Regions:
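Positively charged n-region of N-terminal signal peptides that target proteins for export
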Residues: 1-4
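C-terminal motif of bacterial Sec signal peptides marking the signal peptidase cleavage site
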Residues: 15-18
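Bacterial signal peptide processing site
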Residues: 20-22
Length: 168
């Protein structure tokens, strides 16, 4: 008799446990804690290399050119490949991830345009690249805002590892 009761209650328990499982929460946790680690590292390396030769750290065109060609662009290209290969299970997270890819692609193209501008000494190309960087920053902020909103909606709390921000 106990077996009959147990086996008749078991399917109900399994259905109830499935109700408590949030696939978006699971996908988001996996995304941040596992799938994006390599991408985050590659992005940090590329952006740090760019930050070291731009803005207040700018010294001359040759130094910037060398950093872009030898480190920033190749590393950022690997970052974009990694972004494109991240497995994502839910459409909600996929839509947000696509914003990240769009911003990263735009930033990569801006870096390439800066190299062309330095090679040709064309100030108009620099202006175009700076506009592209600004638009990329906007997309990357949108990504961050949307990922934060999704996390909040699905009860995911972030633990900040590094509070430094890029100047890009």
């Amino acid at each position: 008799m106990k077996k009959v009761i147990f086996f008749s209650i078991l399917p109900i328990m399994l259905v109830l446990s499935a109700c408590f499982n949030d696939p978006i929460q699971d996908d988001l946790m996996d995304y941040v804690n596992k799938e994006m680690l390599t991408a985050f590292e590659l992005e940090a390396t590329a952006v740090s290399a760019y930050d070291q030769v731009s803005g207040l750290n700018y010294s001359d065109d040759i130094t910037m050119y060398d950093a872009l060609v030898s480190t920033v662009i190749p590393t950022y290209n690997e970052f974009i490949k990694e972004l494109n290969s991240v497995p994502i299970e839910t459409s909600e997270l996929r839509e947000i991830h696509e914003i990240y890819i769009k911003g990263a692609d735009l930033q990569y193209n801006a870096f390439v345009k800066i190299v062309r501008a330095l090679e040709t000494q064309d100030p108009l190309l620099i202006e175009e690249a700076n506009g592209m960087l600004e638009e990329a920053r906007s997309l990357l902020r949108e990504y961050q805002n949307e990922i934060d909103k999704l996390a909040e909606e699905h009860n995911v709390d972030w633990e900040e590892k590094d509070s430094s921000t890029s100047s890009i």
